[in-house]
From Swiss-Prot:
EC number per UniProt: 7.1.1.2
TM regions (residue ranges): 1-21, 29-49, 58-78
Leader peptide range in chain numbering: none
Lineage: Eukaryota, Metazoa, Chordata, Craniata, Vertebrata
Record-given protein name: NADH-ubiquinone oxidoreductase chain 4L
Subunit-level organization: Core subunit of respiratory chain NADH dehydrogenase (Complex I) which is composed of 45 different subunits.
Coiled coil spans: none
């Protein structure tokens, strides 16, 4: 396994570990999720460049679109929770139910 793939896998693993450790705050969970998305984007881009396939060139762009949608929804939820309750705890998400 080349060193670049090992570094990207390590970055994904560290972000996943951070997501599991710091899951009580929404902001830290969103940052760890963005780190995971960034490492997946780099991995998909490198795999696409190595395969030289024209049909696979859309995969990194699709990954970026999903990451942007996830970030927008997460930040909107964070703003809603912090404006309402003043805290960014994940267990406040249960309070948003109707």
């Amino acid at each position: 396994m080349p060193l670049i793939y090992m570094n990207i896998t390590l970055a994904f693993t560290m972000s996943l570990l951070g997501m599991l450790v710091y899951r009580s705050h929404l902001m830290s969970s969103l940052l760890c999720l963005e780190g995971m998305m960034l490492s997946l984007f780099i991995m998909i881009t490198l795999m696409t460049l190595n395969t030289h396939s024209l049909l696979a060139n859309i995969m990194p762009i699709t990954m970026l679109v999903f990451a942007a949608c996830e970030a927008a929804v997460g930040l909107a939820l964070l703003a809603s929770i912090s404006n309402t309750y003043g805290l960014d705890y994940v267990n406040n998400l249960n309070l948003l139910q109707c």
